[in-house]
């Protein structure tokens, strides 16, 4: 089987002309899809000018994925779409539906060569989600595969270490050479359980990171300097390929938020707090009410994206009923309660002066590009380590003791982040560094240009 697959892509068939043909393979969920759409858009445009095939895993889970994919191909007619069908297992009680989809992708990745071999012109390289690492690196060893991780460099280090971590105790901080220790509270509990569904496919793919041509990270040199230096020194994990920061990637342009932008235009500069916990973080009704009462007491203008279900199509809640008439009216006097916004448009508005965030990595990079300070409220997964990175880089502060009865803490922290001039200056400095990194001649732009240049030789 392997012999048949590898002979489909002998090294001599790789394209060597001035327009490399690259395949971009995204994972599942908006947290994975968004950076891959940004990458595909960048690679198809100047100065990279690649022929791009974008692989879409079918079926999709959320309405947001469907909407963004449809919009993307409408605005990028030169990018070829390749659907890759996987079999989704039946829903299981207490198992994250996204984990089930991640596993189905990982288990199906070995079938990709059959689909890729039919593409024309021949492929120069693949840029893939980590879920495809084992399948691609074992069946297509002659084809350069750049694993693109959708989290921070620091959390990627932890993922790479999971094969060792799953054998260790969760009672003490995890020490990885060259890096500050990882507190156990920051590490997802499943990482200590090799039988957990997420841990099992993470281990399967992490073992094959060494066969990737490189590890691409949506971060930049000055944001995670110690981690990037340690990873590339060989002291942290000796068998990793080069770890290359290529961010923050330019985001796609969307239609402006007609309902919110006029309201924002009327607010004083840096006076609005943007509140969002991402596409996969659903809060309980009690948490939502606590946060709502805290925001109301803070007397701060805000835009709040309220989410009560992990999967958007399952979110049937009515905001007025959720908050109750009295609190809903009070909140509506000070801000906007919505189900969805164009986040990059909101963060880029001059009226927005702070971001109460779960610290999903896409949100962190979008705030970093614009120098918007973050008040971190991580919920699960990589978010606690991402919050650690945010605080260390000077982009925000991390309140580590959020709990029930948080109204007073909300009031205190919101006032702190909206009125802290030192933090605002620090965040603006991060924004300037992010802009330099992704501008022509910057460290991230140059790194990606060097990769594409190597495919033309």
Curated annotation (Swiss-Prot):
Task: Tell me its EC number(s), please.
Answer: 2.4.1.360
Q: What is the annotated temperature dependence of this protein's activity?
A: Optimum temperature is 45-50 degrees Celsius.
Outcome, altering residue 383 to H: Decreases affinity for phloretin 3.7-fold and affinity for UDP-glucose 2.1-fold
Catalytic residue positions: 32 (proton acceptor), 129 (charge relay)
Would I find Lipoprotein among this entry's keywords?
A: no
Give the matching PROSITE patterns. Answer: UDPGT
Name the positions where an anthocyanidin binds: 32, 94, 381
Query: Where is it made, tissue-wise?
Result: Expressed in cotyledons. Not detected in flowers, leaves, roots and hypocotyls.
Root EC class? transferase
- CDD domains per the UniProt record, alphabetical: GT1_Gtf-like (cd03784)
Give me the residues that bind UDP-alpha-D-glucose, please: 31, 34, 150, 341, 343, 358, 361-363, 366, 382-383
Q: Which reaction does it catalyse?
A: a 3'-hydro-2'-hydroxy-beta-oxodihydrochalcone + UDP-alpha-D-glucose = a 3'-(beta-D-glucopyranosyl)-2'-hydroxy-beta-oxodihydrochalcone + UDP + H(+)
Start and end residues of each stretch annotated as UDP: 279-280
Q: Which GO terms describe its molecular function?
A: 2-hydroxyflavanone C-glucosyltransferase activity; UDP-glucosyltransferase activity
Family note: Belongs to the UDP-glycosyltransferase family.
PANTHER family in the record: GLYCOSYLTRANSFERASE, UDP-GLYCOSYLTRANSFERASE 708D1-LIKE
The entry's protein name is UDP-glycosyltransferase 708C1
Record the organism. Fagopyrum esculentum
């Amino acid at each position: 089987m392997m012999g048949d697959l590898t002979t489909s892509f002998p090294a001599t068939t790789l394209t060597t002309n001035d327009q490399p043909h690259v395949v971009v393979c995204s994972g599942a969920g908006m947290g994975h899809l968004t950076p891959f759409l940004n990458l595909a858009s960048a690679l198809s445009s100047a100065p990279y000018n690649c022929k791009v095939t974008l692989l879409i895993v079918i079926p999709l889970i959320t309405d947001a994925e469907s909407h963004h994919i449809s919009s993307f191909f409408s605005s990028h007619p030169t990018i070829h779409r390749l659907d890759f069908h996987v079999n989704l297992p039946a829903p299981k009680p207490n198992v994250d539906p996204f984990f089930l989809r991640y596993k189905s992708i990982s288990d199906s990745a070995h079938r990709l060569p059959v689909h890729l071999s039919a593409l024309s012109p021949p492929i120069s390289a693949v840029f893939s989600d980590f879920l495809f690492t084992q399948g691609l690196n074992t069946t297509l060893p002659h084809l350069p595969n750049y694993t693109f991780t959708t989290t921070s460099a620091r959390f990627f280090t932890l993922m790479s270490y999971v094969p060792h971590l799953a054998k260790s105790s969760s009672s003490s901080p995890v020490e990885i050479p060259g890096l500050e220790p990882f507190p156990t509270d920051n590490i997802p509990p499943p990482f200590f359980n090799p039988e957990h569904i997420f841990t099992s496919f993470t281990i399967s793919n992490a073992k094959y990171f060494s066969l990737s041509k490189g590890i691409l990270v949506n971060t930049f040199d000055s944001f995670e300097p110690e981690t990037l230096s340690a990873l590339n020194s060989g002291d942290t994990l000796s068998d990793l390929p080069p770890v290359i920061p290529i961010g923050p990637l330019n985001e796609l342009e969307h239609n402006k938020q007609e309902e919110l932008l006029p309201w924002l235009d009327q607010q004083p500069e840096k006076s609005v707090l943007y509140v969002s916990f991402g596409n996969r973080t659903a809060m309980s009704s009690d948490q939502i009410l606590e946060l709502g009462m805290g925001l109301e007491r803070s007397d701060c203008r805000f835009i709040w994206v309220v989410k009560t279900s992990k999967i958007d199509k399952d979110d049937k809640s009515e905001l007025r009923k959720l908050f109750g008439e009295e609190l809903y009216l009070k909140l509506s006097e000070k801000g906007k309660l919505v189900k969805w916004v164009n986040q990059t448009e909101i963060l880029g508005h001059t009226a927005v002066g702070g971001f109460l965030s779960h610290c999903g990595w896409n949100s962190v990079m979008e705030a970093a590009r614009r120098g918007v300070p973050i008040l971190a409220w991580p919920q699960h997964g990589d978010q606690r380590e991402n919050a650690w990175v945010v605080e260390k880089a000077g982009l925000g502060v991390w309140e580590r003791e959020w709990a029930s009865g948080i109204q007073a803490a909300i009031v205190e922290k919101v006032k702190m982040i909206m009125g802290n001039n030192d933090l605002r200056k620090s965040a603006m400095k991060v924004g300037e560094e992010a802009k330099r990194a992704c501008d022509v001649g910057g460290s991230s732009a140059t790194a990606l240009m060097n990769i594409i240049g190597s495919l033309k030789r």
